[in-house]
Amino acid sequence: MVLEATVLVIDNSEYSRNGDFPRTRFEAQIDSVEFIFQAKRNSNPENTVGLISGAGANPRVLSTFTAEFGKILAGLHDTQIEGKLHMATALQIAQLTLKHRQNKVQHQRIVAFVCSPISDSRDELIRLAKTLKKNNVAVDIINFGEIEQNTELLDEFIAAVNNPQEETSHLLTVTPGPRLLYENIASSPIILEEGSSGMGAFGGSGGDSDANGTFMDFGVDPSMDPELAMALRLSMEEEQQRQERLRQQQQQQDQPEQSEQPEQHQDK
């Protein structure tokens, strides 16, 4: 499993209020941030994740590298939806954050959400892409919401940041539809190349062989049908929780009966 430090960059611009992705573009990112965080941690327990907001007056670091999702969640709760996306600045801050990671053995990766029109110039972004490539920083971009305006430029950016011998950076373009944003991410190379099926992310077991084997017993390949795999996992977890509740209820019922027995002997 790849050992990585990952910086997530969220787009908290005014465009993130739009409701074409349930419930809004911003809330779709929150669900996806949790999904990616868990997938990274499940892929390798020594992976760490940081968080940056890309819009507002200036991009800012919401959480330094951590293995605790609570710190990421606190950063998300402190985020305000405002202004426009400063993509180049946010990526530069992410690169600087990666440079100061504690574990220098960790590979460097940025995962950026883009759901608003990019205002940075093409030349500026291509120069930045080449700098990131030179410093061995991989970049994944989740492009949604304003894809007609952004896709061509983001294609060029990813082409510039990628190493031809090893394409470690990816562009995922998502259109509105029945699948949630994180479900599209789950079946993309952003997650699948981590050595995790992605469906273990919310379940906490991380694409282990037992879980995948269970899915295969149902005739489901998690990498091919992540939505069905997720539904099966949730169903199995609910059944496990139901059985656990029944077991606890049975134990509670047995305890009073056991405590009453000595009293009956004393009366006799």
From Swiss-Prot:
Keyword ATP-binding recorded: no
Residue ranges with Low complexity bias: 248-261
Coiled coil: none
Knockout mutant characteristics: Cells are viable.
Biased composition (Basic and acidic residues): 235-247
Recorded GO MF terms: K48-linked polyubiquitin modification-dependent protein binding; polyubiquitin modification-dependent protein binding
Assembly and oligomerization: The 26S proteasome is composed of a core protease, known as the 20S proteasome, capped at one or both ends by the 19S regulatory complex (RC). The RC is composed of at least 18 different subunits in two subcomplexes, the base and the lid, which form the portions proximal and distal to the 20S proteolytic core, respectively.
PANTHER family referenced in this protein's UniProt entry, alphabetically: 26S PROTEASOME NON-ATPASE REGULATORY SUBUNIT 4 (PTHR10223:SF0)
Protein name stated in the entry: 26S proteasome regulatory subunit RPN10
Source species: Saccharomyces cerevisiae (strain ATCC 204508 / S288c)
Phylogenetic lineage: Eukaryota, Fungi, Dikarya, Ascomycota, Saccharomycotina
